Amino acid sequence: MRLIFAGTPEFARVALAQLHAGGHEIALVLTQPDRPAGRGMKLQASAVKQFALDHGLALAQPRSLRLDGKYPEDAAAAREALVAAQADAMVVAAYGLILPQWVLDVPARGCFNIHASLLPRWRGAAPIHRAIEAGDAQTGVTIMQMDAGLDTGAMLQAQAIPIGAGDTTGSLHDRLAELGAQLMLQVLAQAVHGSLQPVAQAAQGVTYAPKIEKHEAAIDWTQPAAVIAQRIRAFNPFPGATAVLNGETLKIWLADVAPGVPPVSKEFGSILAVAPVGIEVVAMKSIVNITQLQRPGGKRLGVAEFLRGFDLQPGMVFERHGS
C-alpha cells in the first residue's frame, strides 16, 4: 500500500520501520521540526526524521498544518506534498500536531492512528503515563480511523496487555510500540482486502490523558505509598519524579511499597530507615521504599551505590510538596 506516515518520537519510529520493512511504499513522511534538546540545547532531529533520512524517504516538517493558523505557508506546502503523494492511506503515530479535516480527506482510504490505550479510556497526549499513574491493571493499543475529534474515531483493531508491578512508562512504551506496529500491519492488510470492520467507541468509560507537565513530578508525601510509587513509575523516564532534601532536588526513579505502617509521630517525608536495598520514607499511613535515585548532574544509581557518595540518615526529612 502507498502510505503517508506522520509521527515524531521513538514510538512512531518503531511503526515506520515495520511498515517500511513490511513492503509498504512510504511516499511521504511528516514529522515535527527539529527541537533543542540535551544539555547543550542543540537542535535534534526526531527519531522518525532520522529513520527517513537513513532510508531516503521524502520528508516534510511543517510547523503547523492549519491553513488559517500561524504558519499558513508551512500548511500550504504540506498540502501540496500530501496531495502529490497520491497515498492510499495515512498512518499517524504520536505525531504531535493537530490534523485539520483537509488532511484527513487527502488519502483515499483516510487516516489510521496508532493510540497507546484501550479506547475510550485515556484519550489524549499521555495515555501510557496516565495508565500507570492510575494503577491500571492493563492497557493496550487501539488502531482507529481518525476523525476530527480527539481520539474519537471508529476502532479498527485493539489488543490488551497487562501492566506489570514493575513497569515504568519507559518499559511499557517499548512493548506498546511493538504491539502498535504489528496491529497496524494487520489493519493495512485488512484494508487491502476490504475486510475492515469499524466499531464505534463506547459512550461510557471515557477518560482523558492530558500532557504531562513538569510540575506534576514533585512527590507529595501526604499521599499513600502505593499512589506515590505509581507516580514515580509513571514519570520514568519523563519528566522524572522529584523530591527535595536539604535544598537539593533529587530524581526518584524507582520505588515500591514497604511493609508496615509508620509511627504516627513521624511527619510525612521523614526517612525511617536507610539500607543498601532501599530508603524507607513516611507517606500517608504507609511507607515508600526508594530503590533508585539520582543527584543533579549525576547518574541514576541503586541505593547501595548512591549511599557511597551521599550521606542519608534516618530522621532526615524530604520537603513537603509545595513548601
Swiss-Prot record:
Protein name: Methionyl-tRNA formyltransferase
Alphabetized Pfam families for the sequence: Formyl_trans_C, Formyl_trans_N
InterPro entries: Fmt, Formyl_trans_C, Formyl_trans_C_sf, Formyl_transf_N, Formyl_transf_N_sf, Formyl_transferase-like_C_sf, GART_AS, Met-tRNA-FMT_C
Keywords carried by this UniProt record: Protein biosynthesis, Transferase
Gene Ontology, cellular component aspect: cytosol
Keyword check for Protein biosynthesis: yes
Task performed by this protein: Attaches a formyl group to the free amino group of methionyl-tRNA(fMet). The formyl group appears to play a dual role in the initiator identity of N-formylmethionyl-tRNA by promoting its recognition by IF2 and preventing the misappropriation of this tRNA by the elongation apparatus.
Annotated binding of (6S)-5,6,7,8-tetrahydrofolate, by residue: S117, L118, L119, P120
Organism taxonomic ancestry: Bacteria, Pseudomonadati, Pseudomonadota, Betaproteobacteria, Burkholderiales
Catalytic activity: L-methionyl-tRNA(fMet) + (6R)-10-formyltetrahydrofolate = N-formyl-L-methionyl-tRNA(fMet) + (6S)-5,6,7,8-tetrahydrofolate + H(+)
UniProt EC number: 2.1.2.9
Family (UniProt): Belongs to the Fmt family.
GO molecular function list: methionyl-tRNA formyltransferase activity
Signal peptide boundaries: none
Matching PANTHER family: METHIONYL-TRNA FORMYLTRANSFERASE (PTHR11138), METHIONYL-TRNA FORMYLTRANSFERASE, MITOCHONDRIAL (PTHR11138:SF5)
